[in-house]
Design a protein with these regions (language model features):
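Accessory carbohydrate-binding/adhesion or oligomerization-edge regions at the termini
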Residues: 1-101, 183, 256, 532, ...
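Accessory beta-strand-rich segments of carbohydrate-active enzymes
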Residues: 2-21, 40, 44-45, 59-63, ...
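Beta-strand-rich binding/interaction modules
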Residues: 148-150, 231-265, 271
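Extracellular recognition modules
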Residues: 181-183, 292-296
Length: 561
């Protein structure tokens, strides 16, 4: 089959998406509640009768230059290798591993990037016995950018490596055999926002999903909880795709096998619901009590599909300069967590579970998702096992501090990049907003600025006023902080002064959070006892996140050179 490959999108600024679906909450639909309830969170993605996981063996051809990519590309004659998806090019022999902290891999001239760059062509053949009424293709993680084609036709384009990229592919599918082609470029304009301290790798590194749904189906949902007195309310809305006529939406809150409450309402395009005076147990990292909330779409009384949310009831408030959860000051005994395994960026369910259970065994109670949103399964595990999460947007421009001059605000204060910033923050929020584990939103890391961050903060304050916003970079501006004061690697004397509210540079009446401290890559860390003596002496000091959870490494098979 022949494809005319787009060779412009990855370098066409300010473009960052074509034909992508709007951001929405992550969920895996099932055709009925009973089957979903009997499925664990680790298996949920892989056992749904409405979702096909396309991960596994794919055809793959690596080109070291875009100019070598045939035009048109004929997949019938293309010499493909076989590759496992998800995977990284650098861990499968196509490029050597490359680690860098601050710099870009090319001269820093935003938004310009090298143009004749490596590109990977992925192909997946799959069969459909019948066509559904709606079909959504989801890439949970691709770096750096992605053009999608199906059955010879162009579908769309995406940047934003760690945010979900979804496409409506119903018009392109057919009964029988289908061919999916994904073209991944090593760099894009978006690379300027992904200059994180890590191995710089490429490829489809998270799962690929195809959901096949009814003409009217669940498209998005939101759940919020609020404490009033000694009880909680739960409110939310369900967004439907398709015609809601003749449908109802049932919302059921379960505590194990016991029903807490249920209601069934007439479906609208946007269906609101509310529960009042719920006598429930609160969620915390120490006692992570969750309730299973099932949202079921019905037609003529029969289930069409269901989704599950692990609902935690907790209240976050800032009282003067003290951060509280459920009315009590808490300490974040945290770590910074990169996606890193012997497979590179690839972290399967077993890897995610191992990290979470190890954290709990070591008395870690918080994790900052440095420096991008994680696989959504990680957040579900944090809900269930009890970890406070600082959910961080996929924004870092650290290379502007190095090459060719020190100019940290170069991108963050440039209005032409604003929509790129807002898109990454908006998609993080929409995907992750229903997780009780999230106690702080983070606007990114080491991106200088403040102008584009201000707009992102305003957006989060508007849509989610109940969760505070953090961004360390603002400490070097006149704003000093958004909702919490954030610094990295502060001297212990400074931490003591802040805790005693006698800091030389007045930071305002806000809690103090060390987003990074006690640097522990390689040899380290030191001074933990001194830091924690200070943190425990003052309610203003929230604690912090050690840099970092695990060293980054490459598997070196025995005998390899």
């Amino acid at each position: 089959m022949k494809y005319v490959i787009n060779r412009e999108n990855y370098k066409k600024f300010p473009l960052f998406e074509v034909n992508k679906c709007e951001g929405r909450a992550y969920f895996i639909p099932y055709s009925n509640r009973e089957t979903l309830a009997a499925t664990s969170c680790l298996e949920e993605r892989y056992k749904s009768d409405l979702v096909t996981v396309l991960s596994g063996e794919w055809d793959f051809h690596y080109y070291d230059k875009v100019s070598k990519l045939p035009q048109p590309l004929d997949t019938d004659v293309e010499a493909f290798d076989r590759i496992q998806v998800p995977s990284d090019w650098q861990r499968t022999g196509y490029e050597p591993p490359f680690y860098v902290n601050q710099r870009y891999q090319f001269p820093c001239k935003p938004p310009k990037i090298p143009t004749d760059i490596p590109v990977g062509v992925y192909r997946k053949i799959f069969s459909l016995e019948t066509l559904s009424d709606q079909s959504i293709l989801t890439f949970l993680g691709v770096i750096s950018s992605l053009d999608v084609y199906i059955n010879g036709q162009y579908v769309g384009y995406s940047e934003g490596a760690h945010n979900s990229a979804e496409f409506d592919v119903q018009p392109f599918l057919r009964e029988g055999e289908n061919e999916l082609v994904a073209v991944v470029f090593k760099y894009s304009n978006g690379t300027y926002l992904e200059c994180q301290d890590m191995f710089r790798e490429n490829g489809i590194f998270r799962d690929v999903l195809l959901s096949r749904r009814a003409a009217t189906c669940l498209n998005d949902y939101q759940i919020k909880t609020k404490k009033t007195g000694n009880t909680y309310s739960l409110s939310g809305k369900v967004e439907l795709a398709g015609n809601p006529a003749g449908h109802t939406v049932q919302i059921t809150i379960m505590a194990g096998d016991s029903m807490v409450s249920t209601q069934e309402v007439t479906a609208q395009q946007s269906t609101a619901f509310s529960f009042q005076d719920l006598a429930v147990r609160e969620w915390s990292a120490e006692i992570p009590t969750v309730y299973e909330t099932y949202i079921t779409l019905k037609k003529d009384g029969q289930p069409v599909e269901s989704l599950r949310n692990y609902t935690g009831f907790r209240s976050i408030t800032i009282k003067k300069d003290v951060f509280t959860l459920n009315g009590k000051a808490i300490k974040l005994k945290g770590v910074n967590h990169h996606d890193t395994s012997l497979k590179g960026y690839v972290m399967d369910a077993e890897d995610l579970l191992r990290d979470v259970t190890l954290m709990k065994s070591l008395n870690v109670n918080a994790v900052r998702t440095s420096h991008y949103p994680p696989d959504p399964m990680f957040l579900t595990l944090c809900d269930l096992y009890g970890l406070y999460v600082v959910d961080e947007a996929d924004i870092e421009t650290h290379g502007t501090c190095c090459d060719p001059i020190y100019w940290p605000n170069r991108i963050s204060n440039h209005k032409k990049w604003l929509q790129h910033y807002l898109d990454r923050v908006r998609r993080m929020y929409l995907r992750d907003r229903n997780h009780p584990c999230i106690v702080l939103w983070s606007l990114g890391n080491e991106a200088g600025g403040w102008k584009n961050q201000d707009a992102c903060c305003e957006y989060l304050h508007h849509v989610c006023p109940e969760i505070p916003v953090h961004y360390e970079g603002v400490i070097r501006t006149r704003r000093l902080a958004y909702d919490v004061i954030s610094e990295m690697y502060p001297h212990i004397d400074h931490v003591r002064e802040v805790g005693e509210r006698r800091e030389k540079k007045k930071l305002g009446e806000k809690p103090f959070f060390m987003c990074e401290y006690a640097h522990a890559m390689g040899v380290g860390p030191g001074g933990l006892a001194e830091y924690w003596d200070a943190v425990l002496s003052s309610d203003r000091l929230m604690g912090g996140c050690i840099w970092e959870w695990a060293d980054h490494a490459v598997l070196n098979p025995e005998g390899a050179k």
